[in-house]
C-alpha cells in the first residue's frame, strides 16, 4: 500500500509565538478541508518557557521579569517545559481520522518516532510507565505535549539534541522533580541537529505511513486579510 503524501517544512530558529500562530492557522485550514495533507514542522525556538493546560506556576523557580525570558501558557497538555536553540522541536499537524482516533495511540506513536530516531545513533530510548516522553539511561531527552481539536493534532515534541540544559534547572520539567533532563550529545558526542532532523523525519514517515515532501511554509499558509 502506497504511503499518503505529507508536507515537511524544515525551519530555522523561530519565535515561539510565530510557530504557534502558524500551527493554529494550519489546524483551522484542515478543519475546513479534511482532505488537506498532513504537515510536519521541524524547527528550533529561542529561549522560552511554556506551560500546558495542567501546569502549575509552583514549578517555576525564577522571576521571569528578572531573567527577561518569556513564560507563556498555551493550550497543549502537560506541565512546564523549556525550549532553546539546539533542541529539535516538531509540530505534526495530522488529521488523526486518517491514522487512528485514539490519543493514547498517538502519544505512543510519537514516542516510537523518537525511539527509532535514537536507535540510528546506537542510543537506546525507553518509555517510563505512567509518564509521557523518552528517556536514555534515566535522563529525559524528549518531552511530548499535544493538543487535538476535532481530531486535528498540533503542538508536539521537543527533543534535546545539543542544547544547553541550564534553563531546565529553573523549573520542575514536565512536573517531574525526581528525574534528570539530558540531551543526545551526552550519549553521542559528535551528533548534529541537522542530521537528527533528517533521521527524525525518516522515522516519522515509517511510523505514521507518510511520504514527506519538502514544502515552503509560505506555500501552505493561506494569506490573511490585513
Curated annotation (Swiss-Prot):
Catalytic activity: octanoyl-[ACP] + L-lysyl-[protein] = N(6)-octanoyl-L-lysyl-[protein] + holo-[ACP] + H(+)
Protein's pathway: Protein modification; protein lipoylation via endogenous pathway; protein N(6)-(lipoyl)lysine from octanoyl-[acyl-carrier-protein]: step 1/2
Binding site for substrate: 76-83, 143-145, 156-158
Record carries keyword Plastid: no
Domain BPL/LPL catalytic: from-to ranges: 34-212
GO BP term (any one): protein modification process
Gene Ontology cellular component list: cytoplasm
Keywords: Acyltransferase, Cytoplasm, Transferase
Top-level taxonomic group: Bacteria
Main location: cytoplasm
Alphabetized InterPro entries for the sequence: aa-tRNA-synth_II/BPL/LPL (IPR045864), BPL_LPL_catalytic (IPR004143), Octanoyltransferase (IPR000544), Octanoyltransferase_CS (IPR020605)
Molecular function via GO: lipoyl(octanoyl) transferase activity
Site (Lowers pKa of active site Cys): 140
Similarity field: Belongs to the LipB family.
Miscellaneous information on this protein: In the reaction, the free carboxyl group of octanoic acid is attached via an amide linkage to the epsilon-amino group of a specific lysine residue of lipoyl domains of lipoate-dependent enzymes.
Function: Catalyzes the transfer of endogenously produced octanoic acid from octanoyl-acyl-carrier-protein onto the lipoyl domains of lipoate-dependent enzymes. Lipoyl-ACP can also act as a substrate although octanoyl-ACP is likely to be the physiological substrate.
Name this protein carries in UniProt: Octanoyltransferase
Organism from which the protein derives: Thermosynechococcus vestitus (strain NIES-2133 / IAM M-273 / BP-1)
Taxonomic lineage: Bacteria, Bacillati, Cyanobacteriota, Cyanophyceae, Acaryochloridales
Protein encoded by which gene: lipB
Amino acid at each position: 500500500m502506497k504511503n499518503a503524501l505529507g508536507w515537511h517544512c524544515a525551519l530555522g530558529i523561530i519565535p515561539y509565538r510565530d510557530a504557534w500562530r502558524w500551527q493554529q492557522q494550519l489546524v483551522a485550514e484542515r478543519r475546513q478541508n479534511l482532505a488537506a495533507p498532513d504537515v510536519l514542522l521541524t524547527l528550533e525556538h529561542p529561549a522560552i518557557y511554556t506551560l500546558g493546560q495542567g501546569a502549575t506556576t509552583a514549578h517555576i523557580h525564577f522571576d521571569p521579569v528578572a531573567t527577561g525570558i518569556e513564560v507563556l501558557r498555551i493550550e497543549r497538555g502537560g506541565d512546564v517545559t523549556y525550549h532553546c536553540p539546539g533542541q529539535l522541536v516538531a509540530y505534526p499537524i495530522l488529521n488523526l481520522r486518517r491514522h487512528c482516533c485514539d490519543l493514547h495511540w498517538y502519544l505512543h506513536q510519537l514516542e516510537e518516532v523518537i525511539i527509532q530516531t535514537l536507535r540510528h545513533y546506537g542510543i537506546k530510548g525507553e518509555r517510563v510507565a505512567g509518564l509521557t516522553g523518552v528517556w536514555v539511561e534515566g535522563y529525559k531527552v524528549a518531552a511530548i505535549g499535544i493538543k487535538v481539536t476535532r481530531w486535528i493534532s498540533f503542538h508536539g515534541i521537543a527533543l534535546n539534541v545539543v542544547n544547553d540544559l541550564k534553563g531546565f534547572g529553573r523549573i520542575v520539567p514536565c512536573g517531574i522533580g525526581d528525574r534528570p533532563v539530558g540531551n543526545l550529545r551526552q550519549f553521542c558526542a559528535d551528533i548534529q541537529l541537522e542530521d537528527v532532523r533528517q533521521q527524525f523525519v525518516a522515522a516519522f514517515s515509517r511510523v505514521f505511513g507518510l511520504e514527506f515532501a519538502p514544502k515552503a511554509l509560505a506555500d501552505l499558509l493561506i494569506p490573511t486579510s490585513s
